[in-house]
Amino acid sequence: MENYCILGNPNVGKTSLFNALTGSYEYIGNWSGVTVEKKVGKLKENVGQLIDLPGTYDLSPISKDETVVTDYLLNDSFSGIINIVDASQLKRNMQLTVQLLELNQPIYIGLNMIDVATKRGIKIDYHKLMKKLKTPIFPVVARTGKGTKYLLGEIKHLGEGYQPHFKINYGEKIEETIKNMCQIIMTETSHDKYQARFIAIQFLLNNMQIANELNSEVVNKLSSLRDQVAEQVGAVSVRREMERIRNHYIETLLQDVVTYPDEDKQYFSSRIDKILTHKYIGMPIFLAIMWLIFQTTFTWIGTPLSDQLDAFIGGTFTDSVKTIMNYLGVIPFLQDLITDGIIAGVGSVLVFVPQIVVLFFFISLLEDSGYMARIAVLMDRIMESFGLSGKSFIPMIIGFGCNVPSIMAARSIENEKERLTTILIAPFMSCSARLPVYALFVGIFFKENQSLVVLSLYVLGIIMAFLVSTVLTKTILKNDNAIFIVELPTYRVPSIKTLWRSTWEKAKGFVRKAGTFIFGGSVVIWLLSYVGPHGINVNINQSFLHMVGSFFGMLVQPLGFGTWQAGATLVPGFLAKEVIVSSMAIIYSSGDAGLVNVIQNQFTPLSAYAFMIFILLYIPCVSTVAAIRKETYSWKWTALAVAYPLVTAYVLTFIFYQVGHLFV
């Protein structure tokens, strides 16, 4: 099967094009740094496989995710490259395009965001550009799918009759050095003359990954030639001279291809950015937007829908299942397991799906509109005081959905210590798995202020992440503050299709977890409540679950929720935070009183909020722990990532409850 790779700058629509060409769905967002590892999909019409590589501005990698690109181009086998560029930022995007052309591999150029360029008054004669580069160019709008069908039909012809032809003349002295380097590379390695020229150029540009691919003897010979030409070039470094020549080539190339509007008019983006990223009013605007989202999720739309679903699952659905089981003569043990264990456990989590969907919809709306990238800029000023940059906030925002991709997104951070710090604080971001716990408790104890209470927990998670990062960056992970440079994407009206796909995929993941982790956890919790030292079908107070819960309940007694029931729900929370709610449904609903009534009797508003603080901050779930181990390659850092949140949660909850108890 033929392999094709898709490459481009960050946030030019690579993943949108990948989704359009393969029919799959990978997470997309209107900001840079969304793709941090290569993704593989099967092209429609069995054309071949398409590999979506992380966005990069240059083939000299400076961050972990960018090494994936250079490593793939050097070591993997592929039939051709699809280089997608932003038509509204063509000159800057051509920097990477030129480097890819120097590979002298079959290549198509996808001219994306033609609609944005047109709105800005930018005119591009892509036919003329195609003739100059002798490379096929396809105008597309990846977000809507316009032009992608034609591109798909042409991909199978990529490479047919291809003849390597691209070459930039870097001047007599540098070209002589490149020639000598090529001779060494072809003699000492298996690379042909075109690959050798590319390697020589990248070596002169100080691409360290290229150097790592060569043996030490070849590196020493090439380094000697580089030092010689550096003396000949004079005061200007070889790299800077080559970049100057390359920039001149691009300017000449685009001179009669791109026409810009006569006036340098102030676009809508610039005007709105002055307000949304303002150092004084930007943050209040962000908090107000988040409040509106939570108000819609918990008061206006989400909760009423959840109440209807709860009534259906707890009433009509459960009664129907009982009737069917009685008709079929199912033994009492299985009846109890299915109704009191599986339906009660899994159903108690599924009732929050409407709230999850509403929240995900609005988060996707903010992402696709381009607003989230502005928040990263806004937060950069604040995060600098805590030893981080705005680049760390992008993975943190992703953590609002799930902490696992949040940790993986830290690959885009160049500074290794800042990357590690971001990984360690990412679990403090309140993921969607914690939302059912919040929804349950705010619906019982804080009916009039549900959105404010939930917002306060999200803000608390961010504050704790900042405070911990301060400690880490001043002690074991000292680093110099990195300069945060981010490309602000154009504001755009979100695509209904994109919003639907994004919301659907996230909600589907939540439901899928209900069918795996939560299902398994519910069965185990019910069995532990059903079995005890004295046999089966025991009173829950004589069960193994009561024994486990009593031990942990004793430990959290000073935190305000020291009952055995609360203690028992904390343990399976390590599996998945949603299991806390399913465990409560099984434990608290085992008696005659309903779940809500029992919780009201065992918690107060103060202890309920303390419980939510603890759930927010204590140990990450098992999937997050696995992601931390994978990204840090260290059991030491993984152990720290498990231990310190638990200590932090205990101390902060203890302080909150004990101080609050003095006034309430």
UniProtKB/Swiss-Prot annotation:
Transmembrane spans: 281-301, 342-362, 382-402, 425-445, 452-472, 516-536, 544-564, 567-587, 608-628, 637-657
Membrane-related topology note: Multi-pass membrane protein
Domain FeoB-type G: 1-161
Keyword terms, alphabetized: Cell membrane, GTP-binding, Ion transport, Iron, Iron transport, Membrane, Nucleotide-binding, Transmembrane, Transmembrane helix, Transport
InterPro entries: Fe2_transport_prot-B (IPR003373), Fe2_transport_prot_B_C (IPR011640), FeoB_Cyto (IPR041069), FeoB_GTPase (IPR050860), G_FEOB_dom (IPR030389), Gate_dom (IPR011642), P-loop_NTPase (IPR027417)
SUPFAM superfamilies in UniProt: P-loop containing nucleoside triphosphate hydrolases
Residues reported to bind GTP 1: 8-15
GO molecular function, one term: ferrous iron transmembrane transporter activity
Binding site for GTP 2: 33-37
CDD domains hit by this protein: FeoB
Superkingdom, taxonomy of origin: Bacteria
Binding site for GTP: 112-115, 141-143
Binding site for GTP 3: 52-55
Pfam families on file: FeoB_C, FeoB_Cyto, FeoB_N, Gate
Family: Belongs to the TRAFAC class TrmE-Era-EngA-EngB-Septin-like GTPase superfamily. FeoB GTPase (TC 9.A.8) family.
Protein name as catalogued: Fe(2+) transporter FeoB
Gene from which the chain derives: feoB
